[in-house]
């Protein structure tokens, strides 16, 4: 995980573009797509909001591999934090520890990585709703 370029697609790409756009000469909410990607899974998990990827009109915005590699420690921390706190999908602490550490970045973590991505997209939706729509 976090070892290949990441793409937001469809409505989520549009929302990330709006969240990273400058709204005057000096100010913007998030400087980079990566900043949204770091914040979104935490917000999605806290609000228990998951979303599925959609293609929409084909809009796409990317986070390049170099950025992911440079921030891999922070991204892995977020992933592990969510796996450790997610009692809904893994009620036993031993199972959550396995998901966070032993299974991280293995073939057995595919479902957990998909869940993490759903929290990322749900978090993008929440950030957009709270910061852009209500503003």
Question: What is each model feature region?
Answer:
Residues 1-25, 50-135:
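Charged, low-complexity intrinsically disordered terminal regions and linker tails
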Residues 28-55:
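Short, basic amphipathic alpha-helical segments that act as recognition/interaction helices
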């Amino acid at each position: 995980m976090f070892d290949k370029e990441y793409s937001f697609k469809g409505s989520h790409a549009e929302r990330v573009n709006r969240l990273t756009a400058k709204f005057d000469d000096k100010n913007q909410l998030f400087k980079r797509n990566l900043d949204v990607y770091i914040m979104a899974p935490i917000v999605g998990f806290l609000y228990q909001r998951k979303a599925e990827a959609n293609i929409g009109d084909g809009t796409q915005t990317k986070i390049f591999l170099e950025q992911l590699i440079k921030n891999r420690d922070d991204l892995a921390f977020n992933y592990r934090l969510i796996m450790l706190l997610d009692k809904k999908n893994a009620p036993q602490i031993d199972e959550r520890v396995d998901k966070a550490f032993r299974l991280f970045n293995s073939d057995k973590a595919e479902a957990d990585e998909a869940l993490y991505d759903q929290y990322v997209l749900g978090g993008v939706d929440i950030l957009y709703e709270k910061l852009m729509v209500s503003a």
